[in-house]
Amino acid sequence: MASAPNPGPSATTAVLASVAALGIWRLLAVAAPHLAALVLMYESETDFGARLSFVLAWGILNFFWIALLRRPALSGALSLTMVVVLVLLSRLKHDVVQMTANFIDLMMIDRDTVAFLFTIFPNLRWSVIGAGLVTLPLMYALWWLDPFRVRRLPALASMLACLAALVGYSLYHPDEAWRGYYDDGYLSKFFRSGVSAVSDFAQYGFMESAASTNERLNMPLVDACHPAGRRPNIIMVHDESSFDIRAAQGIKVPAGYGSHFKSWDGKERAFLAESNGGPSWFTEYNVLAGLSSRSFGRFAYFVTRIATGRVERGLPLALRRCGYDTMSLYPAYGGFMAARSFQVTTGIERFLDSKDLGAKDVEPDSFFYDKALRLMGERTPNKPLFTFIYLGANHFPWETRFRPDLLPNWRAPGNVPSIDEYLRRQAMSAEQYNAFLAGLKKKFPGEPFLIVRYGDHQPEFAPGILEPGLDEGALGKKLDAYDARLYATYYAIDAVNFEPVKSEAVMDTVDGPYLPLVIQEAAGIPLDPSFAEQKAIMLRCKGIFYGCKDGAEARRLNRLLIDAGMIRGL
């Protein structure tokens, strides 16, 4: 009897044989990045839409590298490396400014930003070099281990399919801006923000402005300003993270707290900032350019960098036309958010950053006040001076005691340690400001000074104590809606040998972009046509700027400034 035919190896046996031939390590090299990404997705993405966006973004990255390299193992490793770096940077950004990274961060990165990071983190350069020395051999090993080769055309088609799906989903279901305050969804929010950013840029560019009109502003003439009476020296003080904490219920404050927020006439006045918790440069744009960062929409985070060389309008320029010299003392490196370039664009003639001033680290307010007194003594005789003093001692974190040697008799009121430290630093600021006023009177007897101080934004913990019953999402929605309670700080006007001019512009509550107007009015400086127009807006809108008529007044003023040549390329 003939033997039965041999059916050959089973399908399972064939697969196992193939695996054995390829080697388990080679297969793991291909699979491991995808498994790691899967774990990361479940850890960082919170809902179906975010996870779908993560998968599509992961597909875009992988198929991009496969189309370029044809090796899926190396492509997966490169994609995973990019995602991990993004997550780390996003978490760092959230720790600093309470917002995660988005696509616009990538759009706006430049040499100044990289130089600033390497300067403030001196070990970062070596960390990058070390990471490169470790990563490059690993990538070469993956190149050698990878057993697969994928054709470029199918990979490119797959990448475009993932991109089309992500764009379609993002347009159909755009990510709400308030979700940026959540410390999650790093990859999905980054890619979806790219769709929104490109859409917004195509619609109105970097900055909103109204359609062209027949209205025109006259360009102000140089030295065409002739104020009545003696022009005071003007000092504007940027009071870092300062607001009246009594706005929150249940906070214990030391005796006498609150006097620092009063003006020369005994009144307390409110300043409505356009940021909360971190980005001081929003307010820097407000008080120097006299315009709204909110006009830049999703691009507002980079407002000073975008405005550099483009927005040639502001308080320093207006004062220079009235014969003032202009000077700025800045507590960080001048490359940070293009601070030096931006301030020069708005009319600052002499910009001194922390390196120029000899600052060793975060310095107390007295350091900058003492430097200002010395520098003001070097000014041109009989010529008024505008000085912008940018303070930083009350910057977060408040978990550590700043300069324990200062204010030795301080007694904590009995709040949580971070709030007590915040109050301690406010007390230091008040004491050192009073010493600065005394220094002005002693060093410049008989000379007139107008001093205007403002809190640039509330501290990062403020929303939680102002609205203790709300979770992170509800607070994010209130912040996104610009609830005034979460943006209110203070502004105060003081004077030495000068009586501030009474003006209807010196209101009890003003939006940040109106502060340059308030300063000029209080100093008795004639307004140029652009500020005269802005004063009319201020009176019509009762101290509200961007929020008036859903931004229509701000867009109209932007258009007038564009047509007058004060704003270019936006």
What positions do the PLM features span?
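Membrane-interface transmembrane-helix boundary segments in multi-pass integral membrane proteins
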Residues: 115-131, 190, 198-202, 419-426
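Solvent-exposed soluble domains appended to multi-pass membrane proteins
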Residues: 223-226, 236-239, 244-570
